[in-house]
Amino acid sequence: MIRTRLFGAVALTLCAVAAFAQAGGGGRGAAARVTRHQAPADKALDLPDATLKAEFAEMAAQKLITTRLIEGGAYSLNTRRIVGSEPAQVHKSIIEFYFVREGTATLITGGTLAEGKIRGGVERVVKPGDVVFIPPGIPHGISNTAGISYLNIHFGGTD
C-alpha cells in the first residue's frame, strides 16, 4: 500500500514536472541507451505492466543495461538490468529512485568514492518490491548479482 502510494506520488510529480522540463539527455550508458518516449506535456502516458515486462525481456535478449522509457530533460524514467556489477558513481545534481522488480543484488551507498570504489558505505541486499532513494552527492553502486531489473527515476539534473 505504501509502495503503491509512493509510486503514485512519484508518477504524479513526473507529470507535473513535464510541463516545465527542458529537452535533454545524459545519464549512465548514454552512448548505448535506447529512448522510447519523449515526455508529453499535454497528456498522460501510460506504461502498463505488460509493457514493462516486455521491455525487460527485450533488454535481456539484447544485453542492454539501460533503456530510457521517458525522457523529460530534468527527469527521466529508465529500465535498468544489471548482471554482475557496475562501477560505483556519484551524481552532483541528480536525485534517484530505484524500484526493484526482479532479482537481487548488493547495493552500497554513502561513504566516499575513491578510485572507482566506495569506502565506508552501507551495504545491503535489495530484492523485488524494495524502493531506494539516493540523493545528490551520495556514492552508490550495485554488485554481486546474477541479474537485477529495476525502474530508475532521475530528477533534478543531467550529470
What residues fall within each predicted segment?
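A short, N-terminal "cap"/entry segment at the start of jelly-roll beta-barrel domains
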Residues: 20-88
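Short, conserved beta-strand element in jelly-roll/cupin
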Residues: 92-113
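His/acidic/aromatic-lined binding-pocket segments of jelly-roll/cupin-type domains
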Residues: 89, 95-99, 123-124, 132
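Bacterial N-terminal signal peptides
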Residues: 8-19
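An anionic, turn-rich surface loop/hairpin at beta-sheet edges
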Residues: 111-131
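A short hydrophobic beta-strand segment most commonly corresponding to one strand
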Residues: 146-159
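Conserved metal-binding segment of the jelly-roll/cupin
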Residues: 125-146
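Positively charged n-region of N-terminal signal peptides that target proteins for export
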Residues: 1-5
